[in-house]
């Protein structure tokens, strides 16, 4: 949540997302150099995940431009497990306990109630962000299992997504805006980036 707050408080949310994710990419370079890439079995999932993570950054930035953090963040984070659960049941044949059904209903009702608190466009972008979160949750989990090494997997993921997102943001915003964002709050963006990559690594290891 800390890096989401730093992103929301920035003048340009997309550039802030790039800077924060870029910190994770830079921090991952020495790890990648020391350990090397993950096994080839994980590379396909890495390609999928890079695309999803970049889409996530774009959608989240747009959501924060259109609505408040108090709406966008819970909607995005609440939508993701809901979609993962529904997708697991409908597409993968997973079973769900009665208590899980109750949880799905409660989360769905809570998400619907959030529609009245912000703009409809912002709500839609927040839901799309949740879809991307669900997507990379599934693809990264599969990639880690395929490569059997979460640290090497996430090192390559963060380096690649930084490279791709840098190209996208450079074309959309320009180098001047990117440099200005880094100069404006270097310490906060650095701490947010390091916190984000550490938290996500712990999630994948767990």
Question: Residue spans of the language-model regions?
Answer:
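Membrane-interface interhelical linkers
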Residues: 1-51, 57-67, 116-127, 159-205
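Helix-coil boundary and interhelical linker segments in multi-pass alpha-helical membrane proteins
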Residues: 27-44, 87-99, 142-151, 205-206
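Hydrophobic core positions of alpha-helical segments in small-molecule transporters
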Residues: 19, 48, 75-76, 99-102, ...
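Structural signature of transmembrane alpha-helices in multi-pass secondary transporters
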Residues: 20, 24, 73-80, 129, ...
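Membrane-interface helix-loop-helix junctions at boundaries between adjacent transmembrane segments
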Residues: 60-99, 113
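Hydrophobic transmembrane alpha-helices of multi-pass small-molecule transport proteins
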Residues: 22-28, 85-89, 96-115, 131
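Selected transmembrane alpha-helices and immediately adjacent juxtamembrane segments
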Residues: 121-145, 149-152
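Juxtamembrane helix-start motifs in multi-pass secondary transporters
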Residues: 16-17, 72, 153
